Amino acid sequence: MLIYQDAKNIHTVTLDDCRNSIEEFVAVARYHAKVKFTEGFRKRVSASRKSLEATIASGAGVYGVNTGFGDNVRYRISEDEMVQLQENILRSHGCSVGRILTEEEARALMLMQLMSIGKGYSAVRLEMLEQIRVFLNEGLYPYAPCEGTIGGLSFQPYIAVTYIGEGRLIENGVPCPAAEVLKLHGIKPLSIKAREGLALLSNASHSIGVGLLAVYDFIMTMRHADLCAALVCEALRSTDKAYDPRLIQLKNHKDTSETAEFLCKVLNGSEIMNESRTLRVQDSMNTRIIPHVHGAAKRMVTQTYDALMEELNAVFDNPVFLADGTALMGSNWDATTIELYCDSLAIAVMDVAKLTEVHVERLVDPHLSGLPAFLVKNPGLNNGYMILQYVTAGLLADIALLASPAACFNAAVSAGQESPIYRDDTAARQLYAAVQKLRRMVSMTMMTA
């Protein structure tokens, strides 16, 4: 089932090994559930910080600790400049413009920071994670423009600087200086230390967080879409002939079979359907293919769920620090998996939306449905659902654009040092937007059916 409880009914989420469920994630990001740390979480983070001290003492070159960032990795940073280096990256990298992150997007990003860094390989102080936890529990909402970014690199700093009392927080719907808002809430600004600025940016926090919100919503939407499809079958006087288990099992698709079984169960005993069995030899394709379209989308969301849950439980920092003080530098932050699965699921969303729009179009067309034109008394004088069908067509067009793969783009950045680029953030945001539009389309179909 993937989702076993309603996220809004979860009021407290405890972070221990940070292997939490998608429902718990949504509970914090969307419904403001409180976050708690276990003692094991605290000890693990504190131990990780000690490994950094050993690394610095060794004098070894470590990316982003005693070197510059990106192509500036060639420049060594002295120990007395290490704190300034971290402050600089937070202040210099916040360059995105345009649309502001929604509150649940910002909260999802902050929660991902806790869950990733909290695994104990990022060598930050516990105080930094406590600050993020306080932000979540107090409902503080950073002001973060998010357009014009590669990954989240140019808008995550807008959030991170609020931890140190800079930038802006949205208070009562108005962007206000972070220092003033923190004072109002009795929160002391964090003093950033060596390594900590990069740890807040070297990740895929936003794309994983928004991707999980989209997956959660799509799973819930498909439950409603199945029920809605049963109503459509009745309204169009279709039958369940195409859902015969003897036929469906030959397709050998588990999700298709389960969808067909659900439709048969819901439609069992329907007087309308029983009366319709002799109307035609074969129903229109738009009702026959419901289990196949919905089943394929469910398979894709299951695969995306699995991929994003792996990312949720991953360490994607760079560098990472082992208990013996060894610093390992690589690309665990790489977001190819997020990018590809979010792109693919957006295409599945579009496929469901295509079928949904066809159902509305047939329901309001008297020549196809046999029902009053636009489902209203006195058509001509009254317009009924005429324009509602226009809206579903417009939403479908929007979803088609959002389903264009974000992965099909590249550019050179940081003097070629950090190329190719990945558009995981764009892919996740497009998926999220597509799912919200599909939710509205399903609601409109329910109205017409």
Describe each region flagged by the PLM:
Residues D71-Q86:
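Glycine-rich loop at the start of a catalytic domain that most often binds anionic cofactors/ligands
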Residues C233-K354:
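Accessory "access/gating" subregions that flank catalytic or transport cores
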